[in-house]
Amino acid sequence: MTDVVVVGAGGFSRETLDVIEAHNRVCIRPEDHLNVMGIIDDNPSTINIDRLRSRHYEVLGGLDFLIANRPAEAYVLGIGSPRVKKQIAERLDREGLHAQGVIHPQAVVGSDNIVEPGVIVCSGAQISTNVQLDRHVHVNPNATIGHDTHLAEFTSINPGAIVSGEVYVGPTTLVGAGAVILQGLFVGTGCTIGANACVTKDVPSGKTAVGIPARWAT
């Protein structure tokens, strides 16, 4: 069994708890069980605290509390924003804490994949073969990742998005709900792909791409 804290008290934090709970229900080996010690958030809202308490989870404190008191040595980032994920993970890693990932048992994960620490894959997601998911990549419900694709660290793929085969998505990029990235394309660092956009050509770093076909300011 591994003691963990979930960092973040918002909506994706509770979705992450769903994934952890589903994982625990089916894991066979006791050492694979994830024991959630509590939630870490610097500024949780009252409504989010109440929503977590209704599920018997408590907000323990902020990042300073986690670093000083170490209720667990492993953390799961239940945060959707790629940039915020990066900031928090880099701080916690410097302090010697360890990233923990989790994959929902109802996700479909193919062969020969590389899955680095901190990856979260939600229910209904489909990950094809020879896919690389770098640190703290999040694949939300019903998203699809095609063969031979590489999602770089801190990328978030929102619900229902489709990333086709042979695609590279750069660090800290957000792919919006229902967006489609066509085969063989390159998406740079720190991009935002808008909801329902269809990406038909390479996207330079730092761009926000919206529409069908997706366009961005030059």
Task: Please report, for each region that a protein language model flagged, where it lies by residue.
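Short hydrophobic segments within beta-strands
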Residues: 6-7, 40, 78
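NAD(P)-binding Rossmann-fold cofactor-contacting core
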Residues: 23-50
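Structural signal for interior beta-strand "rungs" in well-ordered beta-sheet cores
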Residues: 101-217
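Short alpha-helical
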Residues: 11-12, 83-84, 114, 198
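Phosphate-bearing ligand-interacting subdomains
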Residues: 44-108
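Short active-site oxyanion
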Residues: 3-4, 35-37, 72-75, 189
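Glycine-rich adenosine-cofactor-binding loop
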Residues: 2-21
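Short amphipathic alpha-helical segments
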Residues: 17-19, 51-52, 87-91, 133, ...
